[in-house]
Curated annotation (Swiss-Prot):
Cellular component annotations (GO), alphabetically ordered: photosystem II; plasma membrane-derived thylakoid membrane
Entry keywords, A to Z: Membrane, Photosynthesis, Photosystem II, Thylakoid, Transmembrane, Transmembrane helix
One Pfam family here: PSII_Ycf12
Annotated GO biological process: photosynthesis
HAMAP family: PSII_Psb30_Ycf12
Protein's name according to its UniProt entry: Photosystem II reaction center protein Psb30
Record keyword Thylakoid present: yes
Predominant location: membrane
Length: 35
């Protein structure tokens, strides 16, 4: 039985993964470009 809190946490984690993916790739690209 899921409450609103659990659903919100799952959506927050999903959004974090979706946003963190490109952010990490961009960070690695910028670090690689500097070096």
């Amino acid at each position: 039985m899921f409450g609103q809190y659990e659903v919100f946490v799952q959506l927050a984690l999903l959004a974090l993964i979706v946003l963190a993916g490109p952010a990490v790739i961009l960070l690695l690209y910028l670090r690689g470009a500097d070096m």
